[in-house]
C-alpha cells in the first residue's frame, strides 16, 4: 500500500517494550532518530525516515509494556460475595485497558490518527501476537482504515531487523485466539476455585503465623496446582520410603598396570544369609579366572541439541544454580541488548537457511573459546558437524544462539556472564563432532560368581573441549587375557540400605512440567515462582523443592475427593486444545465450551465434597478462634437468587448457635432469610437443581437430621428444596420448629410457623401419607380402606391408658411424651413394633380429627456424617402438652429418657456439665 502521488506514508511502529523500540529505531535509522515524549513518560516516541520496499516512510516508533489490556468479569461479578463462584463459568467477561495503561492507550490513539500504516513489532510468539491485536483494537477504534502489518524477527541485530521490515506479513489471528482462550479458561477456573478455597478455609484455620490470615488469598491456578502436585508427590514418595538393607560383594585387583574394580553381576541381595553363603564360597576359592575379554568398542558421546527455553532454564539451574525465573530475566536483558537471540522458543533445530558459520566467526576473538571457534572453521580440522535436529519447531523463532560477540560488558553481573557463556558454548558444541572413546569390559569368575569391570579411554574429546559443563568419566583398566587367573587384592561383603529419591530440583521440576505439557516455554518459570510466592512450596540452597503445610494440605484434600485436580492430565488436555486453536484445527468457542464444562463439573463436585478439604487442613492447622458470626455467614454456599432484593444470591449459612438458614448475601441491606428445621445436624448445597422452583436455578440441599429431634418415620438423610415445593421440610418445621432465634423465644403454646419459601402458614391441606394436596391422610385414596380396628381411637383418654391400635400392623400403641423443642411435653401414640412407623398425636385423636401422622422416607441419599454440635434451636418452652406427675419423657423416636434435662440446652440426653454447647453460647437458655 502506498500513498497516492507517491509521497511518503506515515508508519506507526509499536514494540512490546521501550528498550526494544529504541533498539529497532537505532538499527533502522542508524542512530539518527529524533526523540519526543508520549503521554506515558516510560514510552517515548522515536522519529526517523526509512524506505520499505522502495516506499518512502516517515517512521514513528513507540511501545507498550507487555499486555495493553486485561480480561475481567463484568462489574456485577467482581466482588467475591456478589455471586455464586459457580456462576463465574458463564459470567460475561470483557477486555479493558487498566488505569495504569491509559496513558499508553492515549499515545497510540493520537499517533494512529495521523498514521497510514501500523507495523507491529511485538515479540514473535503467541503472547506477542495477542498483544499485537490489543494494539490493533485500540488503533482501529480511532482510524478504521489503517494498513496493518507484522514484523517477524528473532534477534535485535541489523540483519534480522532490516530483513523483518522489508518482509512484513499479516498478523496471526489464530495465535491471538489461542491466548484469548487460555486467558479466559485460566480466569474462570482460577477465580472460582480461589474464591471457594479462600472463603472455605481462611477464616476457619490459623494458616498465617504473621497474623494476616484475614487478608490472605488461597489461590488456585490451573497450571500452578499440577506443578505443586509434582512437588507433593515426590515428597510423599520420600515419606513413604522404608529403608531396606542389602548386601553386595565387591572385588578389586591391583597390578603393575593399575587398579581394576569389579562389580558383582548379581548386583545385590536383600537376604543376608544368602549373601553370606555366596561370599564365603568366594573366600574359600578366591582364585579369579578371566572369562571374557571382548575387543575394545568405539563409543560416542554426542553433543546436545540446539538450545530451547526449557533446556536453557534446566542447564542454568544445574550448572549455576540459577532459578528459572531469574534465568529468563537475565536472558531477556541479553536479548534486548542484542547479544543473544529471542530466549522464549520451543525450537531445537536450525533452519537450513541459517548462516551457522557466521555465528561461529563472531566468537573467534574471545579469549576463552576463540581458538576453538577458529578450529571449527578450518576445513582440514574435521571438527565441524551440522547440528542435530531436536524435532521441535514452533515456526516463530530459531533455537537460542549468540548474535553478537562480547568478552563481558561493564554492566554485566556474574549471572549475565554465566548465561551468555552457556549460550555460546552450547552453540559451539552443537556444531562440533561427538566425543569418541574406546570401551573395554572384562568378566571374571570366582567360585561360580561373575564380576565385571569396565574401562574407557578417550580417543577424541571434540565438543567436550568447549562444553566444560559435561564430562565423560571413566578409568583405564589393566590389560587382561582370556583364561588368565589372579588372586583379588580385596574381596569384601558390603552392606548398604535403599534410599528414597531426592526432592525435586528445579531442573527436575521443569522436566516434569515439560513432559506433562504443563505451561509453555514462556510461562513455566512463572508458575514455579508463584508457588514460592504464595507459600505453597519452599526451595532450599540446593534448589530442591518441598511443599509447605498449606501446599500439602490442599493437594491432600483434592486427592481425597477423588479428583485429579492436582495432577497434570486435565491441564495437559487444555494446553493441547489451545495448541489446536493456534493451528486452526479447533475454534476458540469449541475449546472454551469443552474445557469449562469439564472444570465446572469438577468445581461443583469439589464443593459438595468440601469436607475432604477441611479434614486435610485439620491435620496441618489449628482451628482459628477469630471467626465471628458475620464471617461464618459469608462463607456459605449459594442456593438461589434472592427473590426479595433481586440483587444478590442467597447462601446456606450456619450461625454461632449451630442453626442453619439460607440468607441473602446482601445482608444487612437485605434481611431475607429461610430458617431450616431445628434438628438439622448437617447441611450442604448439592448440584441438583429443583425442577419446580424459580427463578432458577434453586439448588437442593442435602440434610442430615438428629435422630432424637425428628418424629418416627422421617429419614435422617433428606435431599430437599427450600424454594417452597418440599412438603417434608414443611412438615418437619411444623412439628419440630426452626433454629431461628425469634422462634426459640416464642411464648408457650405458640405453634411454629412454616417459613419455607412460598408458604407462611401451616399447610394443613397436605396429606402426610402420599404428599399430595387436597385431602387429609385419613382420606388418602392410596391407602388400603381402613377396617374397624385400623382407625386409631382413644376409648379412655382420661386414664392415660392407651387403647389405640396401630392401623398398619394392628399392635396396641404406647402413649409417649415428645421432647422436641416445638412439641416438648406433647403426647403421642406410637407402635412398639420394630420397623413400624405408625405415629399419631394424642390430642388430635381425642379431638376426633382422626389424622394419624405417619412419616415418609425422603428418598434422599445418605452421606457420612461429621462431628456436629448436637443441638438445634435454643431451649424454649413446651407448647400445648400435658405433663402429669409420673409421666416419663421419651425422645421423638420412642426411646425413654430421663425426666431430668440439661439446664443449658434442654436436651435430656445429657447433663449440663457434658453439654457440647457449653462453651459456645452466651448462657441465656431460659
From Swiss-Prot:
Q: Which reaction does it catalyse?
A: ATP-independent breakage of single-stranded DNA, followed by passage and rejoining
Which protein family is it in? Belongs to the type IA topoisomerase family.
Pfam families, alphabetically?
Topoisom_bac, Toprim, Zn_ribbon_GRF, Zn_ribbon_Top1
Which positions fall inside the Topo IA-type catalytic domain? Answer: 172-604
**Name of this chain's protein:** DNA topoisomerase 3-alpha
Provide the alphabetized UniProt keywords: DNA-binding, Isomerase, Magnesium, Meiosis, Metal-binding, Repeat, Topoisomerase, Zinc, Zinc-finger
| InterPro entries with a match to the protein in the record | Topo_IA (IPR000380), Topo_IA_2 (IPR003601), Topo_IA_AS (IPR023406), Topo_IA_cen (IPR013497), Topo_IA_cen_sub1 (IPR013824), Topo_IA_cen_sub2 (IPR013825), Topo_IA_cen_sub3 (IPR013826), Topo_IA_core_domain (IPR023405)
Where do the Toprim domain residues begin and end?
10-154
Its organism's taxonomic lineage begins at:
Eukaryota, Viridiplantae, Streptophyta, Embryophyta, Tracheophyta
UniProt lists compositionally biased (Gly residues) regions at 873-884
